[in-house]
């Protein structure tokens, strides 16, 4: 009965209020296919995303050269896709060796190339490098990078080829030279964790009595420190924990570790939302209206100002961004849509960088719990409501609003 009631509430809210709907149909273009999104070719020397290749927002750090005798060589797999031509100048098959993630993206790109240019195939000129011919710390040494052209070597196609590579899911694409496009991916065991947004089980929240409790020990109905405004504004208050949007006690994942100059340190997955200061860190006092924005954890950079929430709200400059493996996945949902974790004010939401939209989307669930009380039984796994919203979001929202890893997780 509870499930059907909440489903009805969800449907009603979406049909009544969603700006993505027009008229009586289920969205823009009801009764006909959507017009395909026009692809914009990359310019010469342009790279996407617009950050350096070996930053966490792109393909991530260099992790060391992979050689045939190294333990990590087992991470590489040969690609024998007949729709891809491998130049293989060394005649060793080295260009065919790559990580599984790189292989998946390359195979996807090969299909796009044949669809756009019938009779033309994807061509790989450089893959894994075991000879040390590339620059220091090149991702070619790890099997995480490829240099590509088209089989007809028509350089007029390379700008669009770069765009197709972006669409295929490469984590960094660079129209590097007139002769090829460079593409790379995250490492297999880096932050390519296929999850939405979560905290590790040992993350600490602040209880109403001032004590700290590990997030894995939280129960529905507990009061935890949060922000009165779902957008990070307002006073610090104690908000009721309604449920967990996901709960996986024994899962091992890689988390971003973000530290500030004040000693605060929070661990969370790539797609989780954090509150940051708009602009520079010249004023690190309490946030004023319009001074707060959200970013994905994977976009956090040293020098940015993170919003803390200990005795009062204040900004603190980020001094370190790293990656660490930890156990457990726990994203709590509070009544106010925020929660202070390890003295850092964070969102309860992830996957889509629209805090107000996310808080609005969970309004039916909060309304349900206001009638029935918080979840009495906390089950492991992804909450059914989160699954519904992800499915609806993929139908209604532009894919560019999603974090790449969160969107990828829904497609598996």
Swiss-Prot record:
Positions marked as site (Cleavage): 197-198
Lipid-acceptor residues (Cholesterol glycine ester): 197
Superkingdom of origin: Eukaryota
GO molecular function: calcium ion binding; cholesterol-protein transferase activity; patched binding; peptidase activity; very-low-density lipoprotein particle binding
Site feature: Essential for auto-cleavage: 272
Record: residues binding Zn(2+): 140, 147, 182
Keyword check for Kinase: no
Site (Involved in cholesterol transfer) residue list: 246
Keyword terms: Autocatalytic cleavage, Calcium, Cell membrane, Developmental protein, Endoplasmic reticulum, Golgi apparatus, Hydrolase, Lipoprotein, Membrane, Metal-binding, Palmitate, Protease, Secreted, Signal, Transferase, Zinc
Tissue expression remark: Expressed exclusively in the notochord.
Sites marked Involved in auto-cleavage: 269
GO cellular component: endoplasmic reticulum membrane; extracellular space; Golgi membrane; plasma membrane
Signal peptide: 1-23
Record-listed E.C. numbers: 3.1.-.-
Positions bound to Ca(2+) 2: 90, 126, 129, 131
Keyword Aminoacyl-tRNA synthetase: no
Pfam family, one: HH_signal
Family: Belongs to the hedgehog family.
Function (record text): Signal involved in the early induction and patterning of anterodorsal ectoderm, nervous system and somites. It is involved in the regulation of endochondral skeleton formation, and the development of retinal pigment epithelium (RPE), photoreceptors and periocular tissues.
Subunit structure, interactors included: Interacts with BOC and CDON. Interacts with PTCH1. Interacts with glypican GPC3.
Protein name: Indian hedgehog B protein
Organism: Danio rerio
Gene this protein is translated from: ihhb
